[in-house]
Design a protein with these regions (language model features):
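Ligand-binding loop in jelly-roll beta-barrel domains
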Residues: 88-113
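Short glycine/proline-enriched turns and hinge-like loops at secondary-structure junctions
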Residues: 53-55, 96-97
């Protein structure tokens, strides 16, 4: 289902087929092709790989679960309700079983994943 971004978009994660990506199972809710200002993904994280984005900033909102996130040389705690801003260039990965909503600015993040492990 695709809707023109100049009007509005509505997507239900339950209606989007997931696929495996660097962080886990991703469901794109607002995609690059939607031509919105950002991309939004619903992600089930499990065994994420350390990576960075050269051109994309990410905002993670933790919906469910708990764990940690490695950001360059730091590690922070994660649990439901926490928001994390990850600027482009920062090496990062989430550790634990988490359900997150990621907002990626600008769009095009799936072409900007640089895995380090």
């Amino acid at each position: 289902m695709s809707t023109i971004a100049t009007k509005f978009l509505r997507r239900d994660p339950a209606e989007v087929d997931p696929w495996a990506e660097t962080c886990g199972q991703i469901r794109p809710l607002i995609e690059e092709r939607d031509e919105a200002a950002a991309e939004v993904h619903h992600v089930e994280i499990d065994h994420a790989k350390l990576h960075y984005h050269a051109k994309t900033d990410e905002i993670y909102y933790i919906i469910d679960g708990s764990g940690t996130m490695v950001l360059d040389d730091e590690e922070i705690e994660l649990h439901a309700g926490v928001v994390v801003y990850v600027p482009r260039g920062v090496k990062h990965k989430a550790v634990g079983k988490l359900t997150v909503l990621t907002v990626c600015i600008p769009r095009g993040v799936l072409h900007d994943v640089h895995e380090l492990e």
